[in-house]
Amino acid sequence: MPNWCENDLTVEGPTEVIEEFLKFAAGESPFDFDRFIPYPEEFRRLDEAAEAWGKEHAGRSDYDWRLQPKDGFNSGGYDWCVANWGTKWPASRVELEGPVTGDDEKTLEVVFHFDTAWSPPKPVIEKAAKLYPALRFELRYFECGCCFNGLF
């Protein structure tokens, strides 16, 4: 079980660009990492196979995974997720606040509140900023288990 990193991502910019961004970002959650940096299909298939195997063998007393040889096999794409998203899993408990109209009535601001495993998803925010250069992204994060926080 990870330490959870709390994230607040503020996105601000022209109304039409924010509306386009919100449509693009929405997938399995309002801010789906997979939309910005897609999780490889090969890992998705392995995840499904591992889940099916686990369900089929649940409760077996003659199998102890801890006794199996350590071969470096990674059925869940853990290393890929950490390298490409900056965290073990996609965002969880994602909530969208807004949009709120700016003072000039030509801009909008939205805030995504979400949790990630162990660390903030900096690579995902960097990719979003490259795809939407007209928007301003600000990520505030706090991980209370190891006592670190930051602004990105």
Predicted segment positions?
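Long, contiguous binding/interaction regions
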Residues: 1-152
